[in-house]
Swiss-Prot record:
GO MF annotations, alphabetized: ATP binding; ATP hydrolysis activity; DNA binding
Subunit structure: Homohexamer. Forms a ring that surrounds DNA.
Chain ranges on the Cytoplasmic side, renumbered to this chain: 179-804
Superkingdom classification of source: Bacteria
Protein's recorded name: DNA translocase FtsK
Organism: Chlorobaculum tepidum (strain ATCC 49652 / DSM 12025 / NBRC 103806 / TLS)
Description of its domains: Consists of an N-terminal domain, which is sufficient for the localization to the septal ring and is required for cell division, followed by a linker domain, and a C-terminal domain, which forms the translocation motor involved in chromosome segregation. The C-terminal domain can be further subdivided into alpha, beta and gamma subdomains. The alpha and beta subdomains form the DNA pump, and the gamma subdomain is a regulatory subdomain.
Family matches, as InterPro entries: AAA+_ATPase, FtsK/SpoIIIE/SftA, FtsK_4TM, FtsK_alpha, FtsK_dom, Ftsk_gamma, P-loop_NTPase, WH-like_DNA-bd_sf
GO terms of biological process kind: cell division; chromosome segregation
Subcellular location: Cell inner membrane
Length: 804
């Protein structure tokens, strides 16, 4: 590395006036007295040795393009120093060397003033040879074609990474500038809030001072009344001494008409009139406590290792978080006045029905606020449930969205969810930029949204293990599917997860066609149709996935493990990928195919979890003829968006409440771990953001191994394992080549077929099964390697002829 750095610096320090001294001074005289005599006249900053090196590279070799292979040696040295794989470094060195030779020849053909410095003796010699053999225009065309081919096939990754690095740098620079501006705006806002707060404190101090004055005045009045009462007491309590009439005020005394003697006005009259009566205040009820929301720890996804390598050593780059739009810098506060008015209306309605509330607490979410009401011990929960419609009508808003939870799970309280006046939007970027998503250890992490307490909900699809989504048109189902797929694209490599996309509506999942070389496996007979749109082909695709499930169970049985996690830990070189099947509209498939669709979906839902196959099924008709009892029983995790009626809500969730949602991403999430559904605001991701992500991934180099699912059975088949075994009798087109490869290396493994023949994992496994059935390799024995039963190629050719 140091030699390469020195040589690069010496070449850039080349000076033409140094050349005469270097020509007359051989290498072996660099330490002689003659060298000392000319050392002071050398212009190269690295002295005589640097001048000698620069003249050698520029005049003798390739000119200034000589820097390119020197830079290649520098990169190779860096790989050695960091103990990285040498393959990429050697590949880059070869590219720089070939590119330097081609550029040197091109400059040797040109007539530019600096052609001598840009070509060197070697470049001019190559240029002379090419122009003599194929002529001047042919030489130019050949060198240009070579440069284009080298750049496209060998230097493309470097150029793409460089452009991505530069764009990422400017993106982070822009983000830094925006962050500085946001910080300044925040400081100005805090300063203004401080000024308003101080002004309010001064006003409060003045009001408090006035209140103290009024209190002192009232206290003096009460003392004066007490003194008058003490003076009047002797005259009232002494029976022997009559009340002295002449000692009272000069005004004539009032006479009681019922008696003949005059009666003095008692002193209590003066006590009643002197102090000011306190105003009567209405009953306000318990004070409302506003609970703070969850503060999620933020994390920059771009700080992780964005550049990774797949199992077949293809470089892959995760999409940058900058492809998603930033959330608007909006005020995170809420309308306390609206909350107070809502609380007063709620308590007023409860008082009408003589329901006492001991404590009330409020949690403000992105779109709704949850009022937790702790009732008096004598109040029964059944009374609240019977008043659900009355309370909802009393608290009704123009947009609806009111839901009553009686009781709240784990608390001695009921909950009332009411829309807030200032909803806060939730965007995709805000839920991905959190610590729990960046550093998760889940197999298939998916982001669902934000809860009422502003907590980002991240769950593992592999643990669900399947997800059923239902809701009316426009409620947010398609956006939710985009959110789930985007979560997986930001967290998993192409060799870790694949998608089978079934879109009867033909337009919802169209942007994901660009992922065909990375995340979308091919299905025999449907190679051109990356996203399945035809209902009959959707049935074939689901049956193909069923066969993949059966094949994986065979591999698990041979390896002696129970699930995909144990298999991947034991067979790291032949690790299985997770397979996520997305059906965007189940209702259309059930109407057109009916029983044919229900059967493979049911089999996958019942059995596919252990082998890493998971379903995401969406429908806008949550009726019992679409979501049948068999399907519903095998989907413990469900999402309900806004639906039309309580019946639809009970069909999808087994409880009502989805009919009260707001729409536009407002949803209820139910899983096997929950006793009651949880209200979540689904994040929003636009189609332009989805297009940017898929385009970024689609432009990257494709995987070397093609991923192919098993061939689906005929329409008369039922997808059983017997049909699978019969269909395997038709050999794969790569069967003979795989047999020759295995016999030649005397080694049989799925990873060998993947690397050498560029086959996907599933197809390579099927070919290995066919080799086993043909007697070429032995049966698998757990983690032990298979034995090659055919020892030479002659015996193999004889066996292949007999098989034909």
């Amino acid at each position: 590395m140091l030699a390469a750095l020195f040589s690069i610096a010496a070449v850039f320090g080349f000076h033409a006036e140094d050349e005469p001294y270097i020509v007359t001074l051989p290498w072996y005289e660099l330490f002689s007295s003659a060298a000392k005599a000319v050392a002071g006249t050398i212009h190269n900053p690295f002295g005589l040795f640097g001048a000698r090196v620069s003249v050698f590279f520029i005049r003798v070799l390739l000119g200034y393009p000589s820097v390119m292979p020197l830079f290649g040696f520098l990169v190779l040295g860096w790989h050695l120093f960091r103990a990285k794989p040498l393959g990429p470094g050697l590949f880059f060195l070869v590219y720089t060397l070939l590119m330097a030779l081609d550029l040197s020849a091109m400059f040797g053909l040109s007539m530019l003033p600096l052609a001598d410095l840009m070509s060197g003796a070697t470049g001019r010699m190559m240029a002379s040879f090419l122009s003599t053999v194929i002529g001047y225009p042919g030489a130019w065309a050949l060198t240009a074609i070579i440069a284009a081919v080298l750049t496209f096939y060998m230097g493309r990754d470097f150029i793409v990474d460089t452009i991505a690095g530069v764009s990422g740098f400017f993106g982070k620079l822009l983000a830094t500038v925006q962050a500085i501006r946001a910080e300044r705006h925040r400081k100005r806002r805090e300063k203004e809030e401080m000024r308003v707060r101080k002004k309010a404190e001064r006003m409060a101090a003045v009001l408090e001072k006035e209140q103290r004055k009024r209190d002192k005045k009232a206290q003096r009045a009460r003392k004066a009344g007490d003194a008058s009462k003490q003076k009047a007491a002797p005259f009232e309590n002494s029976p022997e001494t009559p009340a002295p009439v002449m000692d009272v005020e000069p005004a004539p005394p009032l006479l009681n008409p019922a008696v003949s003697e005059p009666v003095v006005i008692p002193a209590e009259v003066e006590e009643i009139r002197t102090p000011e009566p306190a105003p009567v205040r209405p009953e306000e009820g318990p004070e409302m406590i506003i609970k703070p929301g969850v503060q999620e720890a933020e994390a920059d996804l771009d700080e992780r290792a964005l550049k990774v390598r797949t199992h077949d050593h293809v470089k892959y780059r995760f999409p940058s978080i900058d492809l998603l739009r930033r959330p608007k810098d909006e005020d995170e506060s809420y309308d306390e006045r609206h909350l107070a008015e809502t609380k007063d209306r709620l308590l007023e309605k409860l008082r009408i029905y003589k329901i006492d509330v001991i404590r009330i607490a409020t949690t403000v979410g992105p779109r709704v606020a949850l009022f937790e009401l702790e009732l008096a011990p004598e109040v029964k929960i059944s009374r609240i449930k019977s008043l659900e419609n009355d309370l909802a009508m009393a608290m009704a808003s123009s947009s609806g969205g009111i839901r009553i939870i009686a009781p709240i799970p784990g608390k001695n309280a009921i909950g009332v969810e009411i829309p807030i006046s200032k909803p806060r939007p939730v965007v995709m970027r805000s839920v991905l930029q959190v610590e729990k998503f960046k550093n998760n250890s889940m197999a298939l992490p998916i982001v669902l949204g934000k809860s009422i307490s502003n907590e980002v909900i991240v769950d593992d699809l592999a643990a669900m293990p399947h997800l059923l989504i239902a809701g009316a048109t426009g409620a947010g189902k398609s956006v939710a599917i985009n959110v789930l797929l985007t979560s997986l694209l930001y967290s998993k490599k192409p060799d870790e997860v694949k998608f089978v996309l079934i879109d009867p509506k033909r337009v919802e999942l169209k942007p994901y066609k660009l992922l065909k070389d990375h995340f979308l496996p091919k299905i025999p007979g449907m190679e051109e149709q990356i996203i399945v749109t035809d209902p009959q082909k959707a049935v074939s695709a689901l049956r193909s996935v069923v066969r993949e499930m059966e094949h994986r169970y065979e591999l698990l049985e041979q390896c002696g493990v129970r699930n995909i996690g144990e298999y991947n830990r034991k067979m790291k070189d032949e690790a299985m990928f997770y397979l996520v099947v997305v059906v965007d509209e189940l209702a259309d498939l059930m109407i057109t195919a009916g029983r044919e669709v229900e059967e493979p979906i049911t089999r996958l839902a019942q059995m596919a979890r252990a082998v890493g196959i998971h379903l995401i099924v969406a429908t806008q008709r949550p009726s019992v003829d679409i979501i049948t009892g068999i399907i519903k029983a095998n989907f413990p995790s469900r999402i309900a968006f806004q639906v039309a009626s309580k019946v639809d809500s009970r069909t999808i969730l087994d409880v009502s409440g989805a009919e009260q949602l707001l729409g536009s991403g407002d949803m209820l999430f139910q899983s096997a771990k929950m006793s009651k559904p949880q209200r979540i605001q689904c994040p929003y991701i636009s189609l332009s953001e989805v297009d940017a992500i898929t385009e970024f991934i689609g432009q990257q180099p494709p995987l070397r191994a093609e991923c192919m699912l098993p061939e689906p059975p005929s329409s008369s088949g039922n997808g059983s394992s017997s049909g699978f075994d019969q269909d395997r009798g038709r050999r794969d087109s790569m069967f003979e080549e795989a047999a020759r490869l295995v016999v030649m290396h005397q080694q049989a493994s799925v990873s060998l077929l993947q690397r050498r023949l560029r086959l996907g994992f599933s197809r390579a496994g099927r070919v290995m099964d066919q080799l086993e059935q043909s007697g070429i390799v032995s049966a698998g024995d757990g983690s032990k390697p298979r034995e090659v039963l055919v020892k030479n190629e002659d015996s193999l050719e004889l066996l292949l002829r007999n098989l034909d």
